[in-house]
A protein has these predicted regions:
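Catalytic cores and adjacent flexible loops of soluble metabolic enzymes
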Residues: 1-303
């Protein structure tokens, strides 16, 4: 502890010790938190009574995923429907952009036509962004259309890393960083979607990965956003709940231990256990400026 620097926290106006650094923990076997998520039992909510402080950002807003997540549970929207809904989003968000951004698929001609039609409107808000996998081939679509920001799927739980990606933590981190670096090389701002964060090893993978992202941001002077995705709807807002299920704990880890500014953090929740609204407002209270939503209550599985 004596080697850690003392600094003035400009947010609290208190002298604080420099945070402990968390290196990547590269494991041979996946940590799937079977003690919390047993296949034959209801998922458990465990507590350790570690309370983290509120950290309300100076400004909060909404981002939209109607044309991405919102289409994954229903028949795809037509181009005309997308343009009409985008118009609604513009009106709902108002001139100050409370609905800050909207994300689009780029894979089909219909998707790309919708993007071009919405771009033609010239609205400042919601800004049009895209969603891609961590693939350099996918990134070519973003460059072709000329968007300024894209979401990138970066699955972060060992369920996804080992069983879907069939890689180790270090291998998948290197893959993600290579795609993100290519984004930065072309001047495009990456938004990293931390898929399945509520089943991930927060301090063994998520925080070390986000620390590397913040280093890239310092190097390229281009914002890198972090979207915390509660893919299974397992997040809880109860004080003292353990990570990875604790929404306050996740946001605290991102802001305090990874050094991600509030304005670069979004929460993306699901409503499987009817906690999407509670968890979203909790994310705001604990330091995430953005909450990712879908119109009409429509989203993958439960909205």
């Amino acid at each position: 502890m004596e080697n850690r620097k003392v600094f003035l926290n400009k947010h609290t106006n208190l002298l604080e010790l420099e945070e402990h650094m968390y290196p990547l923990v590269d494991v041979d076997t996946p940590n799937v938190f079977r003690n919390l998520f047993h296949y034959d039992e209801i998922p458990k909510i465990a507590f350790n009574d570690r309370i983290v402080p509120h950290n309300m950002p100076d400004e909060i807003w909404i981002t939209d995923t109607t044309f991405r997540d919102g289409q994954q549970s229903r028949a795809p929207y037509t181009t005309e429907q997308i343009v009409s809904i985008y118009e609604y989003l513009h009106r709902l968000g108002g001139p100050k952009g409370k609905v800050r951004q909207s994300e689009f698929f780029l894979y089909s001609k219909k998707d790309r036509d919708a993007v071009y039609r919405c771009l033609e409107k010239g609205y400042e808000f919601p800004e049009i962004t895209s969603w891609i996998r961590a693939s350099k081939k996918d990134f070519e679509l973003v460059k072709e259309i000329g968007l300024k920001e894209t979401g990138i799927l970066v699955s972060c739980s060992d369920y996804h890393i080992f069983y879907k990606m069939k890689m180790t933590r270090r291998e998948v981190m290197n893959l993600y960083l290579s795609v993100i670096r290519e984004c930065l090389e072309t001047g495009i701002s990456p938004r990293c979607h931390l898929e399945d964060i509520t089943r991930s090893d927060i301090y063994g993978f998520v925080i070390p990965f986000c620390v590397e992202l913040m280093k890239l941001m310092d190097e390229y002077k281009i914002p890198i956003k972090i979207r915390a995705c509660d893919t299974m709807g397992y997040g809880v807002n109860f004080p003292g709940a353990v990570i990875p299920r604790s929404v306050p704990g996740i946001i605290y880890g991102l802001t305090t231990h990874a050094g991600v500014p509030s304005e670069l953090i979004e929460w993306h929740g699901h409503n499987d256990f009817y906690k999407a609204v509670n968890n979203s407002t909790t994310a705001w209270l604990y330091g995430a400026s953005g909450v990712n939503c879908s119109l009409f209550g429509i989203g993958e599985r439960t909205g």
